[in-house]
Amino acid sequence: MFNTAKKILIMAGGTGGHIFPALAIANELKKHSSNIQWLGSNLGMENNIIPKHNIKLHTVSSVGLRGKNVISLIKAPFLLSYATLQVIKIFLKFKPDVVLGMGGFTSGIGGLVAWVFKTTLVIHEQNSIPGTTNKILNKIATKTFQAFDDTFIRNATTSGNPIVFNPIEKQNNNKLNLLIIGGSLGSKPINEIVTQLNIDINIWHQTGKLHADTVKSQYKNSAVKVTAFITEMASAYAWADIVLCRAGAMTVSELMLSATSSILIPLPNSIDNHQFHNAKILSDNNAGILIEQKDLTIELLEGILLNINKNQIKQMSSNALKIAKPNAVKQIVDYLLVSD
């Protein structure tokens, strides 16, 4: 039976990759009248997002350590100490029964404080390669959830990524429909290649807000729909026969849940090259085609699109669905509400 009086602190901040999966869990927890509060950074996008969902937000001073200059590294111990004191104060005031960490700086500090306070610590890793924070916290966490198999060696349950996604039945298209997703800010290297496509297919290109007008003017193909954003991704996946995109954890999970075949171009400078490893999960299961950005050419891309057939697309789509984990939110929420 659920303990609806349980106080739960969710720790996630900085980027959408941490925030939106955590928010999916938080909104489900709220249905059970749980006492939910949020720990984030003072600089992350959570400051604009979380208050809109009627969740109390605590913020601490953000201190990133990877890729910083010497001066920043000298300041880091003092800033870390201050941030730790801020988190301790939050714990003493809220007295959480369980904390959920989604990775990133605030999750790291909060997770260590939870361990010191002997508070139940649950973590979730969204990528196939764990971030530094979760590598550390996995050793002390009460429970670890992972989106993909074999991310951690010990103490981990594969749940999938906690996203709210309701797939729509695929359309039956006569001509190949290619959906290109550039991410919220777009992807200039991908845009420069795909705008050269001059084959008889339908293209829907989500460019990001910075590139919509430029990309639209560069296309040779007249059957192109260019939009800065796509708000209804389920409809877009239903329209698409195949998607060309980066390999962020949420995108890969959506491809699985929507049973959509894909051409994946991992971001080459992603931390620990995690996008490559995310993409490899789909390609290893014959659910996607992996192309490194350095190898992407118009000739290669046109060759793939001209030679792929409906049966191959159907098989890739089926394979993607086979490795999907549609119950991640419920699985994690159930654990949070019944754990001691």
UniProtKB/Swiss-Prot annotation:
Topological relation to the membrane, as annotated: Peripheral membrane protein
Localization per record: Cell inner membrane
GO molecular function, one term: UDP-N-acetyl-D-glucosamine:N-acetylmuramoyl-L-alanyl-D-glutamyl-meso-2,6-diaminopimelyl-D-alanyl-D-alanine-diphosphoundecaprenol 4-beta-N-acetylglucosaminlytransferase activity
Gene Ontology CC annotation, any one: plasma membrane
Annotated GO biological process: carbohydrate metabolic process; cell division; cell wall organization; lipid glycosylation; peptidoglycan biosynthetic process; regulation of cell shape
Superkingdom of origin organism: Bacteria
InterPro entries hit by this protein: GlcNAc_MurG, Glyco_trans_28_C, GlycoTrans_28_N
E.C. number(s) listed in UniProt: 2.4.1.227
Class of the enzyme per the UniProt entry, highest EC level: transferase
Binding site for UDP-N-acetyl-alpha-D-glucosamine: 15-17, 127, 184, 230, 275
Keywords: Cell cycle, Cell division, Cell inner membrane, Cell membrane, Cell shape, Cell wall biogenesis/degradation, Glycosyltransferase, Membrane, Peptidoglycan synthesis, Transferase
Pfam family, one: Glyco_tran_28_C
Reaction(s) catalysed by this chain's protein: di-trans,octa-cis-undecaprenyl diphospho-N-acetyl-alpha-D-muramoyl-L-alanyl-D-glutamyl-meso-2,6-diaminopimeloyl-D-alanyl-D-alanine + UDP-N-acetyl-alpha-D-glucosamine = di-trans,octa-cis-undecaprenyl diphospho-[N-acetyl-alpha-D-glucosaminyl-(1->4)]-N-acetyl-alpha-D-muramoyl-L-alanyl-D-glutamyl-meso-2,6-diaminopimeloyl-D-alanyl-D-alanine + UDP + H(+)
Pathway in which this enzyme or protein is active: Cell wall biogenesis; peptidoglycan biosynthesis
Main localisation: membrane
Main function: Cell wall formation. Catalyzes the transfer of a GlcNAc subunit on undecaprenyl-pyrophosphoryl-MurNAc-pentapeptide (lipid intermediate I) to form undecaprenyl-pyrophosphoryl-MurNAc-(pentapeptide)GlcNAc (lipid intermediate II).
Membership in a protein family: Belongs to the glycosyltransferase 28 family. MurG subfamily.
Protein name: UDP-N-acetylglucosamine--N-acetylmuramyl-(pentapeptide) pyrophosphoryl-undecaprenol N-acetylglucosamine transferase
Annotated organism of origin: Vesicomyosocius okutanii subsp. Calyptogena okutanii (strain HA)
Lineage, highest ranks first: Bacteria, Pseudomonadati, Pseudomonadota, Gammaproteobacteria, Candidatus Pseudothioglobaceae
